[in-house]
Structure formats: C-alpha cells, structure tokens
C-alpha cells in the first residue's frame, strides 16, 4: 500500500527540526518550555523515515542542547543517547507502521514520550546516580494533545 506524501519536503523538515533544536537552546531560562520543545523535537519533528542519519543527528543535537543548558544536570551524554534511541525508534515506526488515525498517533506520541522520559532517567542514573524528577514532565504530557495534533498533519499516512 502506497503512502501519501507528507506536506513538508525532506530539506524543509530538517530545517524545522533544527529550528526545534535552536528553540531548545533559546528557551534555557524556562526549563518547562525547554523540555516541551525538546520532546517535540525528538518525538515529532526529528523522526523522518526518509533519513535515519539526519533523524539521529537532530535528536542527539537536541539532547546535547538540553543537557548542556541545564545547570544542575550532569553532562555525560544520557539525554542525547536516550533522544537518539527514541527518535530512531519513532522513525522506524513511521516507516513500517504509518499512523492510520489521529487517536493512534496520539497514543504513539504518548508512548514515545514516556519512553523518552524513562530512558533519559535511566541513562542519567547510570551516568551520575539518582536525580530528583522534576514536574516539567507533567507539562509535556499535559500539552501532548496540542503538539501531537500539530505534528500529525505532516506524517505520511496510509491512503
């Protein structure tokens, strides 16, 4: 079954994802907004089944931007590694099982966001020991319907 072509071309999609990384850096004074932009970049903007290399690079850049801008966070690579892994999983899912409905897309985004949270916590724990979990993740899950709906429109879906 052929997929419909997404509205954004490949170079434009990369540019939008890089703007997401720049947004992660620019929102450093506001950690809640920064985390929301990081999750949107890793889970919704970076994954592109047409280019796994760019998917990985943009996700890792977003992870390093987040990790490098937080003051009390160890800079040992836990966030970029988790972001890289989740973005590649999301790209694989988009290639082999494109979203068929908006509800399934939102459930997928929720699962990938939760996976990013757990994997990031696990990698940071392995690198530096336990850290307190902050409330910004509640903001991520609370705003999920908004950003998942906005990202839904650019996904290749079954005809």
Residue ranges and their predicted role:
Residues 2-159:
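Terminal, non-globular segments
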